[in-house]
Amino acid sequence: MSVISITDVLAGNFPVNESITIHGWIRTRRDSKAGISFLALHDGSCFDAIQAIVPNELDNYESDVLKLTTGCSVKVTGILVESPGKGQAFEIQATEVEVLGFVEDPDTYPMAAKRHSIEFLREQAHLRPRTNIGGAVTRVRNCLAQAVHRFLHSKGYFWISTPLITGSDCEGAGEMFRVSTLDMENLPRNDEGKVDYNKDFFGKETFLTVSGQLNVETYCNALSKVYTFGPTFRAENSNTTRHLAEFWMVEPEIAFADLSDAADLAEEMLKYVFKAVLEERPDDMAFFQQRVDKTVLDRLNSVINTDFVRLDYTDAITILENCGKKFENQVSWGVDLNSEHERYLAEEHFNGPVVLQNYPKDIKSFYMRLNDDGKTVAAMDILAPGIGEIIGGSQREERLDVLDSRLEEMGLDIADYGWYRDLRRYGTVPHSGFGLGFERLVAYATGMQNVRDVIPFPRTPNNAAF
């Protein structure tokens, strides 16, 4: 059986005045005094529902049709006709309605036909995609993911599947989730009284990865242009609208490239995926514009049509110190910028995307290339109006002696990075890359204010439901 989607029907891909069968869920039911019921059906394939007009002549009209409520699943067969009413081009004159599943108790069904708060929907994550906003977020998220793959494929990049379990700390921050099969009630100890991870499953300490970057660099040094796109994990106790403990990252890596090359790729990719979502999901984007953020379409078009500003960190500090604005966190050279500083630069000073680059080495990771001044590294963050940092990247340190010095400075064990150091010992090359936080991208494209609302099942401190 070939299942027909509502999006194809509404797009005019089926002939009118002929029989058609669709499947879906009831969004609303409205009954007229003339003995006709109007069913709004949706199947998630697009934002809009299709109307089915059901006459009371059907054998199961009173036993089934009049009992249909929001959320019931049905199979409807009927004649596809042009709709005389406003709002949609087609409707179905039903000749058969088969109920596939009733809602057990309509009075307690959490997704009743009314508007719910974002916070309530977060608590009902297993039912959230049934709502207008949940479905729209999901379709836009899918569109953006497909666009990322399509863009990088068109540029000759290979998608690499990097491991989720690692023995390395890519960021050197130590905020990692441990992976262990040891008995927590009876931990093995070594002669020093410390936990003996030699007895663990992998024979060493292992963690959920904070980034696929180190692993994907190995393939970059063989295939030249690669990327990874998958889940990453941070055991960071941050309860903000911009942080998750589990989130997805897009991480391209380019051989024979410097920081400017990575910034160029990032800018081109952002413009490509935003253009794709505007072209491919106009129904969902119209909903976000109307109900969520009335500036979202202008914001995306602005990114598409604006050249990104390139700004050194040192110059940014000068701007922030002299702008006359009172920040909650004061700035000085050497401190990491907060969201308020990033948003001031992107939203007020430049009113557009900013590539902030060449940061102090002490606030960045060990693998970032040390600049000739000995004080800064070739790192960048892309700041976007409305959200702040959306991309972080760098030119990687390809010189073995400098890499070793940076590992030592940050108190990391060189022995844990032997394979990573091999890349610098066997045909080292300049290479660069960046990481795009995918949930931040989805939030930016939809106008949603919290990344917890753009991932199916958010994982945050004290929350791992579903």
From Swiss-Prot:
Its EC number is 6.1.1.22. One of its GO terms (cellular component) is cytoplasm. Transmembrane segments: none annotated. It comes from the Bacteria. GO terms for molecular function: asparagine-tRNA ligase activity; ATP binding; nucleic acid binding. GO terms for biological process: asparaginyl-tRNA aminoacylation. NCBIfam families: asnS, PRK03932.1. Belongs to the class-II aminoacyl-tRNA synthetase family. This is Asparagine--tRNA ligase. The gene is asnS.
